[in-house]
């Protein structure tokens, strides 16, 4: 018996000899056949695993966070331009005859010129497969943003150079810190009058509590904006203003900091100022440390102008090198490795009626490990059942494309017949681990919902329940009542408008919303506490959520403190996990 001369794959063979009994020859050939099958299977498995690892290492999945109007949507579209996913950028406006941003697809978004849902956008650039989780920038749609951040491996924080850190940015930043994910800062709108860049860095460090490391540095701002200095390359990229809706920016002219042409190009005053600021940065600013970036303790900072496409390509190149491919994710059985483990994912978003004509419901899943293949059977852990994921697709805002495969780091949408909930784990049959739950954040505004046409009770209950399951609103009931009286809680008041709009346009139900005087809600942490025995002031209201968990509504923080001082056995939580 000897190896064949076919080097790939390795095979073994045997030659028949007249002295060998035929039965023994057959036995040997059968054993050799089994060995060859095992060798081929092992080699094939290695090839497949190598391909999976190669695809996963190309993935970069990140969210973009910002305060409203900081330029997040514009930056997102310029990324797509460089990736070839779109040809022109649409400017988000409220007029019916205006172009709309690719990432804004719901009718109410197009009418108002805002993003109210999270979009998932995928494109290829420079050998990477990039997944952008484009989140609502409007202050009234932060809860969907919170959940989307749970699916991201890193975040790009967009800051308006004229305003610095704003309220919405602070809220979203806290979620990133909670997850310890890398945070990259893009200070936008440098072509407009802006604050001093040193003030902006100080603002980020003092307000957000994270160290900063400028990768490039602006030369002037507004009408005197001349470009940015690359601290690593020691060159200046000269600013060129182009059409705001155009394709890629013109090639940037790079000049060395000691090049005589640079002083002529930007003027002597700005040149001297640049030299002083670079010297100050080199002596006083934080040094770049990849380990601190990975821990979310140091934020690399970039300056540019998304509207004029200046600094976008430079940012992309740096960002893709500094951020990592999908990392192991926590579960109740420990860390799940994205490469060595088979397919697994978790649901972070549910969206109904993305196609009004089909009344569909899509569950968005972040793949955490392995490879997904269309038609594969998976195990739904929370449902304790095997399930085929039907109609797998990837999204480019409202556009869908059916897919055959996807890898760790990707986000896919699958048809949901009503069995999935936010936070559910999906994995390969034989596995039963659960990924960490996604927090439900406390709403800050509450209304009593009154149905105007009682003949459409069935449609009303179906519609409001489905919208709640998507996570757009939270439904509460009187603690001792049923669905007769429904209280809706939202993170931002504009979500009430979305609720009314969707119930009327998608379910044909008109409602009236009656504001309630409560601003805080807390979940009861200790299940043994009997909320029915609690008799307190009229400043609180006892309710329960859709799963029967007890909660208390408060008018102010003083009510919370007084109740906890009086009820020593009562424990409250600001959020709960699904």
For every predicted segment, state its role.
Residues 10-11, 20, 139, 398:
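Intrinsic disorder/low-complexity signal
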Residues 9, 28-31, 168, 234:
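Intrinsically disordered/low-complexity terminal segments and short unstructured peptides
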């Amino acid at each position: 018996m000897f190896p064949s001369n076919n080097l790939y794959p390795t095979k073994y063979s045997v030659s028949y000899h007249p002295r060998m009994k035929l039965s023994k020859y057959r036995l040997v050939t059968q054993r050799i056949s089994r060995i060859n099958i095992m060798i081929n299977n092992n080699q094939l498995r290695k090839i497949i695993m190598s391909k999976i690892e190669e695809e996963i290492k190309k993935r970069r999945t990140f969210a973009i966070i910002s305060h409203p109007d900081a330029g997040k949507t514009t930056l997102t579209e310029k990324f797509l331009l460089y990736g070839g996913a779109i040809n022109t950028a649409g400017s988000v406006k409220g007029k019916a005859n205006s172009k709309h941003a690719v990432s804004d697809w719901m009718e109410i978004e197009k009418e108002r010129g805002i993003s109210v849902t999270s979009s998932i956008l995928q494109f290829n650039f420079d050998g990477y497969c990039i997944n952008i989780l484009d989140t609502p920038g409007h202050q009234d749609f932060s809860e969907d943003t919170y959940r989307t951040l749970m699916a991201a491996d890193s975040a790009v924080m967009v800051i308006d150079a004229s305003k610095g850190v704003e309220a919405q940015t602070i809220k979203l930043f806290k979620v990133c810190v909670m997850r310890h994910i890398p945070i990259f800062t893009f200070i936008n709108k440098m072509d407009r009058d802006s604050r001093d860049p040193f003030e902006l860095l100080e603002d980020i460090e003092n307000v957000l509590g994270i160290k900063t490391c400028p990768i490039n540095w602006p030369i002037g701002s507004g009408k005197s904006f001349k470009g940015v200095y690359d601290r690593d390359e020691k060159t200046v990229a000269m600013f060129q203003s182009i059409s705001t809706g155009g394709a890629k920016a013109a090639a940037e002219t790079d000049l060395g900091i000691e090049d005589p042409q640079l002083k002529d190009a930007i003027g002597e005053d700005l040149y001297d100022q640049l030299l002083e600021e670079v010297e100050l940065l080199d002596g006083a600013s934080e040094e770049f440390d990849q380990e601190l970036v990975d821990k979310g303790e140091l934020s690399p900072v970039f300056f540019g102008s998304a509207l004029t496409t200046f600094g976008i390509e430079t940012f992309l190149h740096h960002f893709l090198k500094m951020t990592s491919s999908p990392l192991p994710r926590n579960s109740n059985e420990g860390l799940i490795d994205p490469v060595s483990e088979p397919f697994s994912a978790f649901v972070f978003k549910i969206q109904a009626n993305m196609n009004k004509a089909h009344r569909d419901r899509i569950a968005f899943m972040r793949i955490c490990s392995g490879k997904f293949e269309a038609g594969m059977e998976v195990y739904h852990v929370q449902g304790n059942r095997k399930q085929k994921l039907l109609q797998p697709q990837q999204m480019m805002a409202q556009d869908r494309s059916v897919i055959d495969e996807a890898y760790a780091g990707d986000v896919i949408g699958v048809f949901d017949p009503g069995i999935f909930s936010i936070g559910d784990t999906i994995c390969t049959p034989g596995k039963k681990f659960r990924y960490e739950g996604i927090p439900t954040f406390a709403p800050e505004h509450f209304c009593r919902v009154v149905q105007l046409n009682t003949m459409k009770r069935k449609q009303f209950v179906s519609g409001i329940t489905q919208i709640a399951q998507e996570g757009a609103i939270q439904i509460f009931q009187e603690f001792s009542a049923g669905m007769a009286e429904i209280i809706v809680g939202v993170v931002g008041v504009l979500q009430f408008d979305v609720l009314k709009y969707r119930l009327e346009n998608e379910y044909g139900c008109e409602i009236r919303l009656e504001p309630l005087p409560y601003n805080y809600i807390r979940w009861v942490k200790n299940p043994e506490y009997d909320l029915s025995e609690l008799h307190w002031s009229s400043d609180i209201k006892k309710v329960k959520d859709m799963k029967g968990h007890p909660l208390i509504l408060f008018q102010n923080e003083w009510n919370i403190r007084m109740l906890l001082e009086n009820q020593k056995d009562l424990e409250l939580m600001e959020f709960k996990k699904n």
